[in-house]
């Protein structure tokens, strides 16, 4: 057995070591396609490195809108955007209190309203209240507003306690570019207008 102090250790010169490292790098490159920036063109890779959020946004954003009721209008339900978590994204616009559909496709449309009222005094006449909320579609295919989603309720206010009722509905619809989505509400004076209680929106699926 060769004594430990006489073990033969091959020497690798600097040039040979560089060649080995270069070969190893070339072998590993095909498996690096999943790394950020690899497999992209130089300009695309540079953009992804400098603006990663922008690169992701361009590939994932879809048309979407979320509107809230204007609390300053007590006798009408006016929708507003770009405030208190309300927004218009990727082509949606708000015109004449209606959402304009930017592109044809399948959209999930939704809306919610909350109504409240005070108790009646014993001397007052307690007549029932009719509450309703409806999402309507106006399209070039129809000469009138077509109901898409609707809820109705008769409320009989009590003598002792205030009352509170909510309505929510949502469903998917095939819509066409240029379609108009709007709402119609009965019982507007009883609406609880806040960003979390009265809202209306749609987003592409």
UniProtKB/Swiss-Prot annotation:
CDD domains: TNF. Glycans are attached at residues 41, 96. Its main location: secreted. Residues 1-34 form the signal peptide. One of its GO terms (cellular component) is plasma membrane. Pfam families: TNF (PF00229). One of its GO terms (molecular function) is cytokine activity. SMART domains: TNF. It is found in: Secreted; Membrane. Changing residue 125 to P: In allele 8.1. Keywords: Cytokine, Glycoprotein, Membrane, Secreted, Signal. GO terms for biological process: apoptotic process; cell surface receptor signaling pathway; cell-cell signaling; defense response to Gram-positive bacterium; humoral immune response; immune response; lymph node development; negative regulation of fibroblast proliferation. Coiled coil: none annotated. Residues 63-205 form the THD domain. SUPFAM superfamilies: TNF-like (SSF49842). It is linked to Psoriatic arthritis: An inflammatory, seronegative arthritis associated with psoriasis. It is a heterogeneous disorder ranging from a mild, non-destructive disease to a severe, progressive, erosive arthropathy. Homotrimer, and heterotrimer of either two LTB and one LTA subunits or (less prevalent) two LTA and one LTB subunits. Interacts with TNFRSF14. Cytokine that in its homotrimeric form binds to TNFRSF1A/TNFR1, TNFRSF1B/TNFBR and TNFRSF14/HVEM. In its heterotrimeric form with LTB binds to TNFRSF3/LTBR. Lymphotoxin is produced by lymphocytes and is cytotoxic for a wide range of tumor cells in vitro and in vivo. Belongs to the tumor necrosis factor family. PANTHER family: LYMPHOTOXIN-ALPHA, TUMOR NECROSIS FACTOR FAMILY MEMBER. This is Lymphotoxin-alpha. It comes from Homo sapiens (Human).
């Amino acid at each position: 057995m060769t004594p430990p102090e006489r073990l033969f250790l091959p020497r690798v010169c600097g040039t040979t070591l560089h060649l080995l490292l270069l070969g190893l790098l070339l072998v590993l490159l095909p498996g690096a396609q999943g790394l950020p920036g690899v497999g992209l063109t130089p300009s695309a890779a540079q953009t992804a490195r400098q603006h990663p959020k922008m690169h992701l946004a361009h590939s994932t954003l879809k048309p979407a809108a979320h509107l809230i009721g204007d609390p300053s209008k007590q006798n009408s339900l006016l929708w507003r955007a770009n405030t208190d978590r309300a927004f218009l994204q990727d082509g949606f616009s708000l015109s004449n209190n209606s959402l304009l559909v930017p592109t044809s496709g399948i959209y999930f449309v939704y809306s919610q309203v909350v109504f409240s009222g005070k108790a009646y005094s014993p001397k007052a006449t307690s007549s029932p209240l009719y509450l309703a909320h409806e999402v309507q579609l106006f399209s070039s295919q129809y000469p009138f507003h077509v109901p898409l989603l609707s809820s109705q309720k008769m409320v009989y206010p009590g003598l002792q306690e205030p009352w509170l009722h909510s309505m929510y509905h949502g469903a998917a619809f095939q819509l066409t570019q240029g379609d108009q989505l709007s709402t119609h509400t009965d019982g507007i004076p009883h609406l609880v207008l806040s960003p979390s209680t009265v809202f209306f929106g749609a987003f592409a699926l």
